């Protein structure tokens, strides 16, 4: 190292701009060249500061510098930990600079501690100055790295804020889309259930219409047979009447011709009768005169009966009369009554139950319905064998106790029965529970009105031999995919 003349100043000789009062930073490290550039050099160039160059003061200055750098590093680490993670390259560069700075301070401390008390102070000061100059460069590089790291941290923080905002916006949009999708799914489920109900109702109506059309077809076939018979008989009667009318027309024409001839004969006979009457009148007058004369002559003559005269000759045979008019044929008799229908054939075997369809998606929980009216007071408890059926099942909204909507009692509440798989076997069990002989008809689709409250039973499948409907096969209590538009009903046989 180049030897330089070094003049030390005393503490009292230094003014306000000396190293004694200036703040210590990386740019003022050159002030350790104490007697070279200071203002005391102008005043007293030949006097040195013997007290400032002491080794203890130098150690205290180095320790203060070390403590200051340590505090700066602690603040940098706290800032780095409290902010988002920076890039790996910047962190590696910062770590290398900190390690190098620590090693430099450690070497400096070891040198100061191991330096002899009587060594060349000037040589040691120059070494310390070079070390501090190197540390100043390292601190400047470290400050630049820290500034770059701080800029990167601020950029990362801004990006993190933007990312959080984008994530929050995406979360809100996702939540809105999820709510919208759930609402649309619920609406689709409601529409699907309504469509299924309508399809079942229309299927029932179509079945009834098909049965009515079949009955109407049979009635039309019967009417067609009757009409064909009437048409045949009427055609025969019309032909017969046409023939009779033709005969009557011929007879009328013949009768009119005979009438004309009779009229002519009558006119001639009338003239002849007039002439004969005139002649008869004249003869009668002559006979009257002669009779008067004879009567006078015969008064004096006694009358005596003479012998019979001879038999006269046989008269001529009269002309043969005309044949009479043929009589009209009698009317055709009415067709006989329709025969009685034959005995009905034996009832066919019931078909096999179809396979159970897949269970649909469970719908959303509906709103709680209004509180129902207070039910009627039940009968007093008694023998279980005689009270179980009336207390556990009833028929509602019918014209009498023999018909209505089927309701069962469970969990201290009345509920309805779904009509899925509802048939006469199930109705027989219900009617026997109520004391009737059997079922007359079973109904679906809420024939006697829709119920309220829970639907306790669904997919009921009785064999027809059970004592109660609760021994039949059905889904669990309250487990159903039906609505009250599918409540089951029965009409029991009262006879």
Curated annotation (Swiss-Prot):
Biased composition, Low complexity: where in the chain? 323-341
Membrane topology note? Single-pass type II membrane protein
Transmembrane spans: 61-81
Main localisation, per the record? membrane
Q: What SMART domains does the annotation carry?
A: SR
Regions of biased composition (Basic and acidic residues) lie at: 313-322, 364-382
Question: What superkingdom heads the lineage?
Answer: Eukaryota
SRCR domain: residues covered: 393-493
Subcellular compartments: Cell membrane
Extracellular topological domain ranges are 82-495
Q: Report which residue ranges the record marks as coiled coil.
A: 91-111
Write out the GO biological process terms: cellular response to heat; endocytosis; intracellular iron ion homeostasis; iron ion transmembrane transport; protein homotrimerization
Q: Which residues lie on this side of the membrane: Cytoplasmic?
A: 1-60
Q: Region labeled Disordered — which residues?
A: 301-386
Asked whether the keyword Coiled coil is assigned, the reply is yes
Keywords, sorted A to Z: Cell membrane, Coiled coil, Disulfide bond, Glycoprotein, Ion transport, Iron, Iron transport, Membrane, Receptor, Signal-anchor, Transmembrane, Transmembrane helix, Transport
- The protein's recorded glycosylation sites are 102, 134, 193, 231, 254, 397
Protein family membership: Belongs to the SCARA5 family.
Q: How does it assemble?
A: Homotrimer.
The job of this chain, per UniProt, is described as: Ferritin receptor that mediates non-transferrin-dependent delivery of iron. Mediates cellular uptake of ferritin-bound iron by stimulating ferritin endocytosis from the cell surface with consequent iron delivery within the cell. Delivery of iron to cells by ferritin is required for the development of specific cell types, suggesting the existence of cell type-specific mechanisms of iron traffic in organogenesis, which alternatively utilize transferrin or non-transferrin iron delivery pathways. Ferritin mediates iron uptake in capsule cells of the developing kidney.
Name of the protein described by the UniProt record: Scavenger receptor class A member 5
Organism per entry? Homo sapiens
